[in-house]
Amino acid sequence: MMLAREPKYLSKYLSTLVPRLAIRHRGLWIILLLAFTNNLASTELIEFRKGEHQLFAEVALTASQRSRGLMWRMEMADNMGMLFILEPQSRQCFWMRNTYLPLTIAFLNQDFKIMQLNDMTPLSEELHCSEEPAHFALEVNQGWFAQRDIQVGDHLEATLR
Protein backbone atom coordinates (compact mmCIF):
# COMPACT_ATOMS: atom_id res chain seq x y z
CA MET A 1 0.00 0.00 0.00
CA MET A 2 1.30 3.39 -0.89
CA LEU A 3 0.32 6.88 0.05
CA ALA A 4 -0.70 8.37 -3.28
CA ARG A 5 0.05 11.93 -2.18
CA GLU A 6 2.88 12.64 0.25
CA PRO A 7 2.45 15.22 3.01
CA LYS A 8 4.43 18.36 2.12
CA TYR A 9 4.46 20.01 5.53
CA LEU A 10 4.94 16.99 7.80
CA SER A 11 7.45 18.62 10.14
CA LYS A 12 5.22 21.69 10.59
CA TYR A 13 2.26 19.44 11.32
CA LEU A 14 4.21 17.27 13.73
CA SER A 15 5.43 20.30 15.67
CA THR A 16 1.81 21.25 16.42
CA LEU A 17 0.69 17.68 16.94
CA VAL A 18 3.37 16.77 19.49
CA PRO A 19 2.08 18.98 22.35
CA ARG A 20 -1.49 17.72 21.89
CA LEU A 21 -0.40 14.08 21.83
CA ALA A 22 1.92 14.52 24.80
CA ILE A 23 -1.15 15.13 26.89
CA ARG A 24 -3.37 12.39 25.48
CA HIS A 25 -1.09 9.68 24.08
CA ARG A 26 2.24 9.37 25.85
CA GLY A 27 3.33 6.39 23.68
CA LEU A 28 2.77 8.22 20.42
CA TRP A 29 4.57 11.28 21.80
CA ILE A 30 7.68 9.09 22.24
CA ILE A 31 7.43 7.83 18.65
CA LEU A 32 7.19 11.36 17.28
CA LEU A 33 10.12 12.51 19.40
CA LEU A 34 12.22 9.64 18.05
CA ALA A 35 11.21 10.55 14.51
CA PHE A 36 12.45 14.11 14.94
CA THR A 37 15.87 12.78 15.92
CA ASN A 38 15.88 10.26 13.04
CA ASN A 39 16.15 7.32 15.41
CA LEU A 40 12.87 5.68 14.45
CA ALA A 41 13.52 2.07 13.52
CA SER A 42 11.23 0.35 11.04
CA THR A 43 10.49 -2.21 13.74
CA GLU A 44 8.94 0.31 16.15
CA LEU A 45 5.36 -0.69 16.86
CA ILE A 46 2.28 0.98 18.23
CA GLU A 47 -0.17 -1.23 20.06
CA PHE A 48 -3.81 -0.43 19.39
CA ARG A 49 -6.56 -1.73 21.65
CA LYS A 50 -10.32 -1.69 21.49
CA GLY A 51 -11.72 -3.60 24.44
CA GLU A 52 -10.18 -7.08 24.39
CA HIS A 53 -8.93 -6.71 20.80
CA GLN A 54 -5.26 -5.93 20.16
CA LEU A 55 -3.39 -4.90 17.02
CA PHE A 56 0.27 -4.01 16.49
CA ALA A 57 1.10 -1.50 13.76
CA GLU A 58 4.44 -0.62 12.20
CA VAL A 59 4.88 3.13 11.89
CA ALA A 60 5.38 4.54 8.37
CA LEU A 61 6.74 7.99 9.16
CA THR A 62 9.55 8.63 6.68
CA ALA A 63 8.80 9.41 3.03
CA SER A 64 10.37 6.10 2.02
CA GLN A 65 8.30 4.12 4.51
CA ARG A 66 5.11 5.91 3.47
CA SER A 67 5.67 5.37 -0.24
CA ARG A 68 6.55 1.67 0.23
CA GLY A 69 3.83 0.95 2.79
CA LEU A 70 2.82 -2.71 2.60
CA MET A 71 3.91 -3.16 -1.03
CA TRP A 72 5.39 -6.50 -2.07
CA ARG A 73 4.37 -8.32 1.12
CA MET A 74 2.77 -11.69 0.55
CA GLU A 75 1.47 -12.22 4.08
CA MET A 76 0.89 -10.35 7.31
CA ALA A 77 -0.03 -11.72 10.74
CA ASP A 78 -3.69 -11.31 11.65
CA ASN A 79 -3.00 -8.84 14.47
CA MET A 80 -0.54 -6.67 12.50
CA GLY A 81 -0.95 -3.52 10.43
CA MET A 82 0.73 -0.28 9.40
CA LEU A 83 0.09 3.24 10.71
CA PHE A 84 0.63 6.26 8.46
CA ILE A 85 1.00 9.70 10.06
CA LEU A 86 -0.68 12.18 7.73
CA GLU A 87 -0.94 15.89 7.03
CA PRO A 88 -4.45 16.58 8.36
CA GLN A 89 -5.17 19.80 6.47
CA SER A 90 -6.26 17.92 3.36
CA ARG A 91 -7.89 14.70 2.24
CA GLN A 92 -5.50 11.79 1.86
CA CYS A 93 -5.59 9.13 -0.86
CA PHE A 94 -4.13 5.62 -0.94
CA TRP A 95 -3.93 2.96 -3.62
CA MET A 96 -2.93 -0.70 -3.79
CA ARG A 97 -0.27 -0.67 -6.51
CA ASN A 98 2.13 -3.61 -5.93
CA THR A 99 0.22 -4.55 -2.78
CA TYR A 100 -0.76 -8.22 -2.77
CA LEU A 101 -2.71 -8.32 0.48
CA PRO A 102 -6.42 -7.43 0.67
CA LEU A 103 -6.55 -4.59 3.18
CA THR A 104 -8.97 -2.42 5.10
CA ILE A 105 -7.89 1.16 5.69
CA ALA A 106 -9.17 3.15 8.66
CA PHE A 107 -8.84 6.92 8.53
CA LEU A 108 -8.44 8.23 12.10
CA ASN A 109 -8.64 11.66 13.71
CA GLN A 110 -6.15 13.05 16.25
CA ASP A 111 -7.85 11.09 19.07
CA PHE A 112 -7.70 7.79 17.15
CA LYS A 113 -11.42 7.88 16.48
CA ILE A 114 -12.28 5.89 13.36
CA MET A 115 -13.71 8.35 10.84
CA GLN A 116 -13.95 6.04 7.83
CA LEU A 117 -13.31 2.40 6.84
CA ASN A 118 -12.60 1.26 3.27
CA ASP A 119 -11.87 -2.23 1.93
CA MET A 120 -9.19 -2.22 -0.77
CA THR A 121 -8.55 -4.72 -3.56
CA PRO A 122 -5.00 -6.05 -4.09
CA LEU A 123 -3.02 -4.62 -7.02
CA SER A 124 -5.66 -1.98 -7.77
CA GLU A 125 -4.80 1.61 -8.64
CA GLU A 126 -8.24 2.81 -7.55
CA LEU A 127 -7.84 5.68 -5.10
CA HIS A 128 -9.28 5.37 -1.60
CA CYS A 129 -9.50 8.89 -0.21
CA SER A 130 -10.50 10.16 3.19
CA GLU A 131 -13.83 11.97 3.07
CA GLU A 132 -12.49 14.46 5.63
CA PRO A 133 -8.96 15.47 6.60
CA ALA A 134 -7.44 12.64 8.68
CA HIS A 135 -4.46 12.62 11.05
CA PHE A 136 -3.69 8.92 10.64
CA ALA A 137 -4.41 5.99 8.35
CA LEU A 138 -4.26 2.45 9.70
CA GLU A 139 -4.04 -0.45 7.26
CA VAL A 140 -4.94 -3.94 8.44
CA ASN A 141 -5.86 -7.28 6.90
CA GLN A 142 -9.21 -6.95 5.17
CA GLY A 143 -12.08 -7.69 7.53
CA TRP A 144 -10.09 -7.21 10.76
CA PHE A 145 -12.38 -4.43 12.01
CA ALA A 146 -15.63 -6.11 10.87
CA GLN A 147 -14.71 -9.44 12.49
CA ARG A 148 -14.31 -7.64 15.82
CA ASP A 149 -17.36 -5.40 15.43
CA ILE A 150 -15.15 -2.29 15.46
CA GLN A 151 -16.90 0.46 13.53
CA VAL A 152 -16.79 4.06 12.40
CA GLY A 153 -17.08 6.24 15.50
CA ASP A 154 -15.15 3.85 17.76
CA HIS A 155 -11.98 5.06 19.50
CA LEU A 156 -8.74 3.03 19.58
CA GLU A 157 -6.25 3.24 22.45
CA ALA A 158 -2.62 3.62 21.33
CA THR A 159 0.58 2.68 23.20
CA LEU A 160 4.23 2.50 22.09
CA ARG A 161 5.59 -1.06 22.23
Describe the predicted segments one by one.
Residues 1-23:
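N-terminal secretory signal peptides that target proteins for export/translocation
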Residues 42-161:
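Compact, glycine-rich, soluble single-domain proteins
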Residues 24-37:
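Bacterial N-terminal signal peptides
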Residues 15, 23-24, 66, 78:
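Generic detector of intrinsically disordered, low-complexity, polar/charged segments
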